[in-house]
Amino acid sequence: MQNYKVSIAYDGASFYGFQKQKSRPTVQGKIEEVLDLLIKDYELNYSGRTDAGVHAKEQVLNILTDIKITEKLISSIDKLLGSSISVNSFNQISNDFHARYSAKERTYVYSTMDNQKKLPYLLNSTHQHNSSLDLEKLNEISQLFLGKNDFSSFAKVEKNKNPEREIFKSVWKKNSNIFTYTITGNSFLRNMVRNLVGVQLAFNDNKLTLKEIKSQLDKPDGNRLNYIAPANGLTLWKVKY
């Protein structure tokens, strides 16, 4: 079999998440529908699942198949995927490459705007926050998450799964009234990025204190800080190998 690395982008507003579901449109479901038609016999892997409404600038797949994947075939795949999914690039790669298990870093970007001015044309990709945002305050809290930590208070942790993750970058930037949060880590727990964004927005709004947040990082007590930011502001930005 030959192994192909494929980078795709998608508009999450069109899907109920990445992972295949019965009778609901998902990114994986659409991809498999097209591959079943054009390739038939294959194994599909992906770098990670995204929730309903979450977008991707670069989601990475690997496809193991006996069929030779050419530019022409990729063009046909891209066309059949429709307007909400696009193939960025593809290349043949060694058979030991796995889109998920070979990944070293993943970067997500969260986009939000404060309540000073509504921009309706951005609502599918940018969260409209209901209060003013303070860049200095947001970056004060974002630095807490750097390094290795137990994030069990900031995510939905599956049974017997190690809740420790390492964060390499955690920073907010502002352009006009658009605030973007960039986070890079070795991997993320379920809902972790949206939960971290939600906690930071709650801190911005004085609903949580620095002490409360830090205590759950230093000594998680099983009580999740359940502040989940809306999915529409989140984009899987890049996967590094």
Feature annotation, model-predicted:
Residues 1-241:
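Structured-RNA-binding interfaces characteristic of tRNA pseudouridine synthases
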